[in-house]
Amino acid sequence: MKIIYYSNPYFADCDFPLIKELREQGHQIIYILLFTKDSLKSTLIDINTPYPQNGIFKPDIYKELNIYKDFIGYNDTYIINNVIPQKSIFEKIKFAHKVIKFINSFKADYIWTTRPFQKEEWPLYFFNKVALTIHDPFPHSGENLSKEKSLNKKIALNFSKKIFILNERLKNDFCVKFKVSPLKVYTNKLGRYDCIKLFHNDQITINKKPYILFYGRISPYKGIEYLIESFLKINKLHPELNLIIAGSGKLYFDFSPYKNIKSIELRNYYINMDETAILFNNAEFIVCPYTDATQSGVIMTAFTLNKTVVASNVGAINETVIDHQTGLLVKPQNIEDLSNNISLLYTNKKLRSTIEENIKNIYSKGENSWENITKQYIDSLKK
């Protein structure tokens, strides 16, 4: 198939291996990555200086992307650089027209996007078959869509020919809430976030004591306050164990009582990929104490490195974390259950080793491999 894959840096960690596999299976993929001033530091992308011109370019305008050149390939890969705000609606429409004309010139079988189009881009729905991947079908706690984003989502759901969500459990609720026909909604899953294996920097400082890791953007639904309280209970029994909390975002709770606790380390900034790789590789395991969620890219990053997780049993997390097989599931917002399971996984090395071997076998081949995930996508697009 000939597909335009139109996405943004926020999903690069799961998009890059998907694009790689699609191309390896012989499909012509025109990969278009939209850069805005707010997306220059996100997931795999760590750009310090924006290219000082809006337009459509090859990826080599950003040297920071060169590490991925051999992984995804630069043929048929483009950057829409929209980092300089347009001063008027006329400029916005003019730029959008240029993008639409460029996209339409490929005459693709599908435009496959991970983002509802902005209103200036709406004509793309009328002249193309559009497939939409929705990573988060419902807003997280403490996060609400603006009126503009809600409208863009409504238009996208109405006019997209195919809609993909990344778990089975939420499909029915999604269709009911947004009044979408189940016939055009297809489910799939995330695969391994393989790009993390490209990174390793021994010069980044890391705690030499054993530690468990919370990683990801800090937001109210992440449940970090429950993790800290659980860890304090564990730390009395295992004073050698540390907790690292790593991620950008505004702290939504009072961290000051924990500031001087030496066994708790807060890295509250954008974590680049070198540091991410070091943190994951050296952690005992990862903890995802979410109060609500759909699926989790953090879990897939952990699984890529065969690291197990302790995760709250919320949303569709249990489709990925199978209790005592690929991780441990705990009751959300339950400090006792969380601390018990963290202690179990920390002290039971045999259990951890068994789980890590399961992860390796399940995600390197079979139905959870990118090869199978990609074939499912193509089969859905052909229906």
Indicate residue ranges for each PLM-predicted region:
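Acidic donor-binding loop of glycosyltransferase active sites
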Residues: I278-T294, K307
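Nucleotide-activated donor-binding/catalytic signature segment of Leloir-type glycosyltransferases, i.e.
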Residues: D254-A277
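Membrane-proximal helix-turn-helix segments that form the acceptor-binding/catalytic region
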Residues: H97-N104, S146-L166
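Conserved donor-binding/catalytic core segment of Leloir-type glycosyltransferases
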Residues: T205-K222, I228-F231
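Conserved acidic donor-binding segment of nucleotide-sugar-dependent glycosyltransferases
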Residues: D323-H324, L328-I335, I342-K350
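Short hydrophobic beta-strand element within catalytic cores of glycosyltransferases
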Residues: T308-A311, V321
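A short, well-ordered alpha-helix in the C-terminal region of glycosyltransferases
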Residues: E240, D337, L344, L351-G366, ...
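Donor nucleotide-sugar binding/catalytic pocket of nucleotide-sugar-dependent glycosyltransferases
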Residues: F159-L198, I373
